[in-house]
């Protein structure tokens, strides 16, 4: 007999004490167990049944009663139910009851069902599975529970409701289509509601199923008004009443009880076949008690399911009707908030149900997402996902999934957090609240597939510890041809995101027409589309992330053909069929030394340019010219990378018809008999009110150096040509030095000394207008191919040098910078010279004891290195060195480096052993020997030099034996290398522990470095090393040291680089020492000290470690006082944060 026959004998439940309920709880029987034991008798074809009476009770009220109910028509289901009338049923889950089960509908408050779970009345609904192994719902003992409907073994009996994990929750009691669903509790009209069990008479109970007609079938259990609903599970509001247990599809709810064949009574839970009914409910073992799902989870699920269902009126048929079209999208699996480590994979998933299928749109912070190579959007059936292989900070924010079809749209969202700290291995993963889509296949009895279970994702590999940026790969210095494409690529490593910045001379490089910068996670590339001269320089790649920074540098040299020779070629010494053509060198050699010059000629007959000859010097003797033609000349410069454009064209020139005279005779006349041209000597003061352009036309540039630039000037009033020397003078100290030099030159009016004729001061420039000397440096003139070097020429040069220096000394002045670069030839043909550059000259008259610490190592006297008082004899030592080189092409003291050179000078060791002196006269050797005396008192003075037998020789009649110039050429090549690649820097700028006091060196007018001597060069002589720690008395305003820019506190990450920068002012140049926690710092690979001549000082600490966390002090000291500035370096070490897992668990 159908169990519903018992409903006719339903009596009002009797209240039982709490103790009795605890005693009898093992005999509770779940009503679904009763259904499982029933056979499948056949029933006649259902007839139309009359509408149910208002008093028809809900069958679940029977299960909540405390007594057995007699069966109708003499049959009883007491044995099937196995219930004692005096026993009270327990709630699902063995939770203690605070009252008896309430009636399902229209019952009084005291008769409503108590919460299903293990909660007290005042508590909200606990998860279905928040208790120990659930007891059967009826009053039967566990061993006496009803058999399942299908002839299954006891092991296949119904498992306790909810005895699975959250992802394995029971399938809803009604997994059928909307037409067959249990109506929401209380969502039908009063006429259709089931009256509560307690308010009905026995005669109003349900008729047996077999006798019922189709019209008399039970209405869905839940078709009552809100007031008649099952009380909420817990203290939930009516809107939170018992919904279908799981995420059932709307089309899978229970069939109507009536009007069905016996075998079809109460369709199985879910989509199971008749023989497999209620399998989803029963297939979990008691030991699989699940962890509770939170209150909020159930709430969301309940509300989800309510929104997913659509109410339909009318009774159900035997077969399930098809789903209604136009179902609004619903999210059966919603997005969950996610927290991932930077660099980990980010995966967001949700499941959307809709008919027809919805169009899915993803947004991040309101911006629509599209599939890229980094972000992958996918939709497989109802499963939608967003996948990002490596999450970055910009991927954090609010993600929203919007589903849209013909019905109203639906959406769900979640927050994604990307953190950069490594996640703890023991940290609890965020709880997964989503569920996977259910299988479309029917479950198999006795297997775990009865309920679709979402498996936990495999544990992710812990992310690598965050690291500061590194540059594991970077190009070496490069030399490229002009016009070539240049690509500088730096590979980067470390924790992303890493910002890459290219800089040149501390200025950031921006994309332009010629330069492109491309950054990626792999590195950064700087591309120069076509290299040009202005692209030369040092390029720095700076990489930074949140943990620190790192930089690397590369020097780029763009080589090209040289610039054309400056100025206009000049024809001189014009004879009957020859002339001497001279010109200036190129203003820029193209990054490679000019190897030769190509001379081109044009005549008035052929009227075309042709190459005449190739020479290495800046002058050439043109022969075989015809007197009836006019000639023009131009010159090209040649280096290893090509030939320059031609220079300006010379003026038209015609050769004379007078007979050619011997060259030597003419030179003798021009040198010995020719009188010095009269010079307009002037006393010059600096003009600060007018500009140089007011009086002179500024033409082409003749040269440049560290001091500034030299331009060709043409005096507007007279048309005379002068040289304008433009000095850079930014500070007041620099502007004071130039007038001092002009003041000395005002006293030096002599034919062998260059003259200053005017001076102007303009903003950052001071301009000196000087007498022009166009013959070039003395030693450059000597190695010219058309110049024959003999001892006779050497005597002529040394005589002029001695005359000029003698005049300087008579004025009480010492030059202190005599060297080949400061001896200039007046023209390209004769032997007349002039001394230039009086920037380091000092007055000895009334100066007392004067000590200096500057000079060029190869030509400086021992007393300068020893920091002893100087005298006029200091210049005589330099004259002796110049004479030694002039006659032999060898340098007496030059070593492989500056230290060796200084050691040789201080020891005054030299000799004439080389074969170069085999052809030199004894008088010449004696002259040199009397100048290169270590004791300056034993040296010849200028007057004695001019009276020496060697300089007294008659140059007209003496034998002119030609000397080899090969050694001189080698010497000049070595000197050129030293000037460009190994120039000595100013004293006070090089030292590992401290900066040594002294004067800043500067280049002479010809570009040769004039540099003070560093302590490193003096380490070979212990007796003089202390001399360089003393202050130097100079004719400059003395200033106490101070910092115009101080160092600042730094905070860096272990493994990166730190840099302290400051700027130091003061004179004499301060001694600078760096300290780390009161300990002086010695320069090494770890600690690098950089100091330029402008006073900028830097301490660079590479590969910072924890030991570098300290206070750093820069101290500057000179004779007037001292100054310090201090900053702190904070080093952050990389440590994994503790307690992170606990924080995540709390969340």
From Swiss-Prot:
Q: Bias regions of kind Acidic residues — which residues?
A: 662-677
Q: Could you name the domain of life of the organism this protein comes from? A: Eukaryota
Q: Where in the cell is it found?
A: Cytoplasm; Cell projection, Lamellipodium; Cleavage furrow; Cytoplasm, Cytoskeleton, Stress fiber
Query: According to the record, where are the sequence repeats?
Result: 100-111, 112-123, 124-132, 133-144, 145-156, 157-168, 169-180, 181-192, 193-204, 205-216, 217-228, 229-240, 241-252, 253-264, 265-276, 277-288
Compositionally biased spans, kind Polar residues: 644-653, 1002-1013
In this protein, the active site sits at 817 (proton acceptor)
* Region Calmodulin-binding, residue ranges: 26-41, 943-1006
Provide the residue span(s) of the region labelled 16 X 12 AA tandem repeats: 100-288
Q: Which SMART domains match?
A: FN3 (SM00060), IG (SM00409), IGc2 (SM00408), S_TKc (SM00220)
State the name under which the record lists this protein: Myosin light chain kinase, smooth muscle
Organism the protein comes from: Oryctolagus cuniculus
Q: Which gene encodes it?
A: MYLK
């Amino acid at each position: 007999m159908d169990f519903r026959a018992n409903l006719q004998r339903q009596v009002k439940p009797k209240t039982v004490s709490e103790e009795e309920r605890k005693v009898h709880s093992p005999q509770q029987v779940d009503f679904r167990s009763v259904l499982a034991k029933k056979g499948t008798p056949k029933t006649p074809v259902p007839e139309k049944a009359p509408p149910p009476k208002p008093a028809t009770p809900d069958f679940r009220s029977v299960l909540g009663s405390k007594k057995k109910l007699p069966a109708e028509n003499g049959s009883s289901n007491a044995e099937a139910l196995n219930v004692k009338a005096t026993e009270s049923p327990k709630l699902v889950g063995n939770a203690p009851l605070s009252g008896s089960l309430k009636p399902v509908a229209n019952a009084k408050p005291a008769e409503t069902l108590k919460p299903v779970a293990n909660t007290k009345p005042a508590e909200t609904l606990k998860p279905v599975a928040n208790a120990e192994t659930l007891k059967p719902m009826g009053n039967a003992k566990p061993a006496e529970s009803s058999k399942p409907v299908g002839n299954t073994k006891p092991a296949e009996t119904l498992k306790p409701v909810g005895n699975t994990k959250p992802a394995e929750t029971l399938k809803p009691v009604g997994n059928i289509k909307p037409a067959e669903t249990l109506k929401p509790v209380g969502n039908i009209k009063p006429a259709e509601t089931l009256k509560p069990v307690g308010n009905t008479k026995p005669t109003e109970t349900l008729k047996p199923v077999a006798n019922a007609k189709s019209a008399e079938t039970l209405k869905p259990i839940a078709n009552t008004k809100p007031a008649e609903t099952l009380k909420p599970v817990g203290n939930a509001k009516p809107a939170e009443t018992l919904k279908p247990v799981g995420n059932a599809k709307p089309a899978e709810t229970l069939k109507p009880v009536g009007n069905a064949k016996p075998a079809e009574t109460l369709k199985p839970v879910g989509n199971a076949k008749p023989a497999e009914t209620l399998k989803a409910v029963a297939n979990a073992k008691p030991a699989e008690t699940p962890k509770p799902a939170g209150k909020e989870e159930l709430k969301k699920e309940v509300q989800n399911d309510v929104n997913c269902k659509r109410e339909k009126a009318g009774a159900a048929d035997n077969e399930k009707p098809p789903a209604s079209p136009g179902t609004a999208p619903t999210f059966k699996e919603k997005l969950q908030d996610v927290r991932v480590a930077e660099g980990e994979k980010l995966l967001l998933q949700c499941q959307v149900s809709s008919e027809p299928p919805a169009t899915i749109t993803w947004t991040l912070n309101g911006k629509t997402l599209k599939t890229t190579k980094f972000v992958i959007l996918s939709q497989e059936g109802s499963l939608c996902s967003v996948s990002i292989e490596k999450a970055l900070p910009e991927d954090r924010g609010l993600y929203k999934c919007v589903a849209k079809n013909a019905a109203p749209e639906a959406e769900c969202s979640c927050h994604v957090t990307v953190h950069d700290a490594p996640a703890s291995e023991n940290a609890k993963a965020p709880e997964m609240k989503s569920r996977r889509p259910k299988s479309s296949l029917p479950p198999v009895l006795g297997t775990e597939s009865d309920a679709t279970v979402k498996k936990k994702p495999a544990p992710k590999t812990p992310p690598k510890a965050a690291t500061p940026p590194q540059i594991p790969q970077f190009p070496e210095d490069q030399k490229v041809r002009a016009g070539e494409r240049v690509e500088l690529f730096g590979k980067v490593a470390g924790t992303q995101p890493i910002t890459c910045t290219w800089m040149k001379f501390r200025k950031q490089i921006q994309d332009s027409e010629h330069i492109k910068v491309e950054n990626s996670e792999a590195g950064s590339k700087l591309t120069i589309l076509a290299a040009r001269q202005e692209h030369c320089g040092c390029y720095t790649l700076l990489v930074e992330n949140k943990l620190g920074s790192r930089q690397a540098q590369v020097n780029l040299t763009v080589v090209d053909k040289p610039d054309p020779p400056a100025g206009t070629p000049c024809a001189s010494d014009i004879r009957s069929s020859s002339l001497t053509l001279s010109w200036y060198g190129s203003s820029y050699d193209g990054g490679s030394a000019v190897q030769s010059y190509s001379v081109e000629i044009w005549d008035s007959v052929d009227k075309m340019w042709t190459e005449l000859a190739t020479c290495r010097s800046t002058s050439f003797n043109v022969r075989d010219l015809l007197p009836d033609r006019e000639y023009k000349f131009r010159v090209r410069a040649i280096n290893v990378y090509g030939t320059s454009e031609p220079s300006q064209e010379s003026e038209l020139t015609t050769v004379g018809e007078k007979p050619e005279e011997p060259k030597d005779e003419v030179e003798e006349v021009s040198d010995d008999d020719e009188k010095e041209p009269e010079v307009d000597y002037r006393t010059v003061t600096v003009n600060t009110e007018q500009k140089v352009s007011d009086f002179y036309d500024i033409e082409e540039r003749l040269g440049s150096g560290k001091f500034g630039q030299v331009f060709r000037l043409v005096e507007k009033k007279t048309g005379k040509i002068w040289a304008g020397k433009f000095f850079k003078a930014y500070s007041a100290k620099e502007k004071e030095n130039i007038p001092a030099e002009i003041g000395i030159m005002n006293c030096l009016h002599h034919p062998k000394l260059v003259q200053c004729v005017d001076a102007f001061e303009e903003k950052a420039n001071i301009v000196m207008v000087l007498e022009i000397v166009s013959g070039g440096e003395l030693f450059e003139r000597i190695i010219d191919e058309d110049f024959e070097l003999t001892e006779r020429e050497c005597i002529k040069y040394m005589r002029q040098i001695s005359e000029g220096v003698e005049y300087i000394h008579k004025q009480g002045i010492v030059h202190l910078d005599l060297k080949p670069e400061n001896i200039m030839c007046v023209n390209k043909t004769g032997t007349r010279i002039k001394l230039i550059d009086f920037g380091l000259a000092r007055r000895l008259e009334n100066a007392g004891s004067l000590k200096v610490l500057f000079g060029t190592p190869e030509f400086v006297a021992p007393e300068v290195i020893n920091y002893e008082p100087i005298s006029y004899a200091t210049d005589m030592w330099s004259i002796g060195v110049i004479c030694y080189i002039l006659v032999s092409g060898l340098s007496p003291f030059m070593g492989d480096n500056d230290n060796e050179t200084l050691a040789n000078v201080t020891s005054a060791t030299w000799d004439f052993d080389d074969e170069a002196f085999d052809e030199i006269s004894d008088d010449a050797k004696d002259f040199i020997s009397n100048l290169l005396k270590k004791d300056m008192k034993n040296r010849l003075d200028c007057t004695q030099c001019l009276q020496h037998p060697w300089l007294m020789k008659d140059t007209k009649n003496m034998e002119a034996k030609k000397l080899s110039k090969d050694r001189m050429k080698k010497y000049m090549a070595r000197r050129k290398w030293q000037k460009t690649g190994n120039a000595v820097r100013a004293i006070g700028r090089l030292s590992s522990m401290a900066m040594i006091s002294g004067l800043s060196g500067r280049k002479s007018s010809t570009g040769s470095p004039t540099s003070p001597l560093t302590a490193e060069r003096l380490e070979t002589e212990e007796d003089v090393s202390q001399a360089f720690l003393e202050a130097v008395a100079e004719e400059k305003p003395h200033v106490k040291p101070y910092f115009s820019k101080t160092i600042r506190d730094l905070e860096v990450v272990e493994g990166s680089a730190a840099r302290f920068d400051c700027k130091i002012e003061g004179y004499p140049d301060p001694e600078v020492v760096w300290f780390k926690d009161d300990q002086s710092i010695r320069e090494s690979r770890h600690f690098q000290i950089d100091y330029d001549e402008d006073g900028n000082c830097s301490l660079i600490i590479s590969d910072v470690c924890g030991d570098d966390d300290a206070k750093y002090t820069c101290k500057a000291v000179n004779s007037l006082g001292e100054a310090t500035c201090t900053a702190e370096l904070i080093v952050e070490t990389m440590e994994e944060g503790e307690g992170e897992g606990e924080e995540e668990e709390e969340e």
